[in-house]
């Protein structure tokens, strides 16, 4: 649970900071009305894609690993009545994220109306590094952290 919370903090923090850059560039925070972000800010769009993949718990994200542990723990404990609504809520969140963020990245837009001075490549690079670290934690786990998780779980 601690690893899951830490990963969510890093990923959602990166996601929301990148959304603030989107707001500065487009002049509003209505993500569904905006588009063309890949052409306006390629590095920022890469951060958004990586955050989206991490938030929907796509492997090798650390959230995939922790949610898998949570769900297998629920099922092995016979708590299917908790598992079903949580899994349905997770599917709804994944749908909502994809429905809101993918149009921002792929919809055509008039790039003349976008304030490209609002881009912050240094911030985007740091955010991308944070998200890549969470992907690395999903692939490679420090032995000490694995021992701590095993001690807590078992």
What are these regions, as identified by a protein language model?
Residues 1-118:
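Functional transmembrane alpha-helices
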Residues 83-84, 125, 143:
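Enriched - but not universal
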Residues 87, 126-137:
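Hydrophobic core of alpha-helical transmembrane segments in multi-pass integral membrane proteins
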Residues 117-128:
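C-terminal membrane-solvent junction of multi-pass transporters and transport-like membrane proteins
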Residues 137-154:
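Juxtamembrane boundary at the C-terminal end of a transmembrane helix
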């Amino acid at each position: 649970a601690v690893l899951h919370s830490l990963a969510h903090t890093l990923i959602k923090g990166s996601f929301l900071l990148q959304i603030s850059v989107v707001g500065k560039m487009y002049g509003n925070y209505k993500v569904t009305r905006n588009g063309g972000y890949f052409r306006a800010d390629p590095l920022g769009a890469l951060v958004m894609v990586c955050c989206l993949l991490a938030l929907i718990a796509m492997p090798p994200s650390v959230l995939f690993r922790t949610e898998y542990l949570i769900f297998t723990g629920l099922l092995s404990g016979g708590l299917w009545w908790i598992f079903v609504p949580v899994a349905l809520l997770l599917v709804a969140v994944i749908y909502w994220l994809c429905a809101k963020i993918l149009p921002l990245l792929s919809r055509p837009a008039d790039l003349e109306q976008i304030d490209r001075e609002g881009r912050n490549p240094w911030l985007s690079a740091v955010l991308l590094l944070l998200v890549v670290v969470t992907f690395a934690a999903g692939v490679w786990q420090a032995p000490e952290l694995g021992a701590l998780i095993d001690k807590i779980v078992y």
